[in-house]
Amino acid sequence: MQDAITSVINSADVQGKYLDGSAMDKLKAYFTTGALRVRAASTISANAAAIVKEAVAKSLLYSDVTRPGGNMYTTRRYAACIRDLDYYLRYATYAMLAGDPSILDERVLNGLKETYNSLGVPVGSTVQAIQAMKEVTAGLVGADAGREMGVYFDYICSGLS
């Protein structure tokens, strides 16, 4: 896992250079939004279960996947879906705090699409639920923090598509 600081420094180090104006601007932006990211993470942490519950209600609860024969039918499959959404929310929050999506590749996306396809998990429904979670989260944390979190939700959706 990297963060925005490590990413900027590693890039300069690989090139054997000091940090240039562009690198300094990236660091400045990261530090400027630090308090916003910490407040958003605190709000998300305190409301994680409610965020997931509302996202499921908005996107999956009354769709074909929850009816008999659907991929979320049976309590066990439904619970696994809820667990996965909570997992995506948690790791998107970590990535937002770090200002870098690398943790999403390392801990969430590597091999996930293939696993879902082999298990018959409907990726489209999963992406729909993540987009609903993005909307619910933005409503809770505000527009600026919601846009920042949205970057990482979109990153997960892109990795699954």
From Swiss-Prot:
The modification N4-methylasparagine is found at residue 71. The keyword Kinase does not apply. InterPro entries: Allophycocyanin_b, Globin-like_sf, Phycobilisome_asu/bsu, Phycobilisome_asu/bsu_sf. Keywords: Antenna complex, Bile pigment, Chromophore, Electron transport, Membrane, Methylation, Photosynthesis, Phycobilisome, Thylakoid, Transport. (2R,3E)-phycocyanobilin binds at residue 81. Heterodimer of an alpha and a beta chain. Contains one covalently linked phycocyanobilin chromophore. The chromophore is added by the phycocyanobilin lyase CpcUS. It comes from Picosynechococcus sp. (strain ATCC 27264 / PCC 7002 / PR-6) (Agmenellum quadruplicatum). It holds the Pfam family Phycobilisome. It is a peripheral membrane protein. Gene3D superfamilies: Phycocyanins. Light-harvesting photosynthetic bile pigment-protein from the phycobiliprotein complex. Allophycocyanin has a maximum absorption at approximately 650 nanometers. GO terms for cellular component: phycobilisome; plasma membrane-derived thylakoid membrane. This is Allophycocyanin beta subunit. Belongs to the phycobiliprotein family. GO terms for biological process: photosynthesis. It is found in: Cellular thylakoid membrane.
